[in-house]
């Protein structure tokens, strides 16, 4: 006999786990389906692990300048990349364990496996059919690997990486070419430059951090350049040949090399495989209204998969809003 729930949430990131906990606290019988580890991109492959790297970089730079504060050190200041990665893993594990504890404490049934959404009323996990009155899709997004000549081959060799692979790289790169000057690219540029890597950012737009206010963009670009990071704007990558990146700037093609090449050109909603539901889409993004409802009754979509604002705190608020709408609690609606 199938288990029955009021709400099944597919995806255990910030939107999914917050929605699940909130629904349970409101008294609903709720299940959360996650194929990897709860916490999503933010806790496992994004916000949190990158901040641990930034903290290590900050400590390293502070110690190097310790004499400015009247503190002397003996010998040359160095770093152990494997220990930096290990510390990152420890912080991530601590936080994801905390999320798992909160889910259990609040009585959420967690299913580890791929959630196959058959309809608004059925989700199959590991061959088990779960029945529900409502489904919340919180499947997140994945980094885009652009169809630039040579990128696929270099990606398969581990030379081209996305942010997810770069967080777990074992051999520290002495040089790195970063394609894309958005938040992710700039964050990694800051980290690797701090530890002494030669860093080059290639950005198609007229400046880095294109979604930020101009005052911030200009000021931070100056800071990065002062610290030795090369920033190439209005530049387009034409091809990749193993460690070599050829780009076009002002009508002239130039080739540079890097131990690693980071592709940070954006993300794409994880909506593949949901076509049979008849969802209204905007490219890969699932269209939703202010209550996070899709065009299919009983199906909601929150977080990166709806493509509105791909930020963890936005996903969390969307999750709460969707749950309140399902359970008819209050009159909350999203106002971006």
Curated annotation (Swiss-Prot):
Gene Ontology CC: cytoplasm
InterPro entries reported for this sequence: Class-I_Pyr_Nuc-Dis_Oxidored, FAD/NAD-bd_sf, FAD/NAD-binding_dom, Pyr_OxRdtase_I_AS
Cofactor, free-text remark: Binds 1 FAD per subunit.
UniProt keywords, alphabetically: Cytoplasm, Disulfide bond, FAD, Flavoprotein, NAD, Oxidoreductase, Redox-active center
Catalytic activity annotation: N(6)-[(R)-dihydrolipoyl]-L-lysyl-[protein] + NAD(+) = N(6)-[(R)-lipoyl]-L-lysyl-[protein] + NADH + H(+)
Annotated NAD(+) binding sites: 180-184, 203, 237, 264-267
Binding residues annotated for FAD, in chain numbering: 34-42, 51, 115, 304, 312
One GO MF term: flavin adenine dinucleotide binding
Entry's Gene Ontology BP terms: 2-oxoglutarate metabolic process
Localization in the cell: Cytoplasm
Intrachain disulfide bonds: 42-47
Known role: Lipoamide dehydrogenase is a component of the alpha-ketoacid dehydrogenase complexes.
Family: Belongs to the class-I pyridine nucleotide-disulfide oxidoreductase family.
Further facts: The active site is a redox-active disulfide bond.
Quaternary structure and partners: Homodimer.
Protein name: Dihydrolipoyl dehydrogenase
Lineage, opening ranks: Bacteria, Bacillati, Mycoplasmatota, Mollicutes, Acholeplasmatales
Gene that this sequence comes from: pdhD
């Amino acid at each position: 006999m199938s288990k029955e729930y009021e709400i099944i949430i597919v995806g255990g990131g910030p939107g999914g786990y917050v929605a699940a906990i909130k629904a349970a606290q409101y008294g609903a019988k709720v299940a959360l389906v996650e194929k990897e580890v709860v916490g999503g991109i933010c806790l496992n492959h994004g916000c949190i692990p990158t901040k641990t790297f930034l903290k290590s970089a900050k400590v390293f730079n502070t110690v190097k300048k310790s004499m400015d504060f009247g503190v002397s050190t003996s010998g040359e200041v160095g770093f152990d990349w494997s220990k930096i990665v290990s510390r990152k893993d420890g912080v991530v594990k601590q936080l994801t364990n905390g999320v798992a504890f909160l889910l259990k404490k609040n009585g959420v049934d967690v299913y580890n496996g791929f959630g196959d959404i058959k309809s608004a009323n059925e989700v199959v996990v590991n061959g088990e059919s779960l029945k529900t009155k409502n489904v919340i899709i919180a499947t997140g997004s994945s980094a885009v690997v652009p169809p630039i000549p040579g990128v696929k081959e270099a990606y398969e060799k581990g030379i081209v990486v996305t942010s997810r692979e770069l967080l777990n790289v074992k051999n520290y790169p002495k040089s790195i070419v970063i394609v894309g000057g958005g938040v992710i690219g700039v964050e990694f540029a800051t980290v690797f430059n701090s530890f002494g890597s030669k860093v080059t950012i290639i950005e198609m737009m007229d400046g880095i951090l294109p979604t930020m206010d101009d005052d911030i963009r200009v000021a931070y670009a100056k800071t990065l350049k002062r610290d030795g990071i090369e920033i190439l704007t209005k530049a387009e990558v034409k091809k990749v040949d193993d460690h070599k990146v050829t780009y076009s700037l002002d009508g002239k093609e130039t080739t540079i090399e890097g131990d690693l090449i980071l592709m940070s050109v954006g993300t794409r909603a994880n909506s593949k495989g949901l076509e049979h539901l008849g969802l209204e889409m905007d490219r890969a993004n699932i269209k939703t209204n202010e209550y996070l409802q899709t065009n299919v009754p009983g199906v909601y979509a929150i977080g990166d998969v709806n493509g509105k604002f791909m930020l963890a705190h936005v996903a969390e608020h969307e999750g709460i809003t969707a749950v309140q709408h399902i359970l008819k609690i209050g009159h909350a609606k999203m106002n971006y």
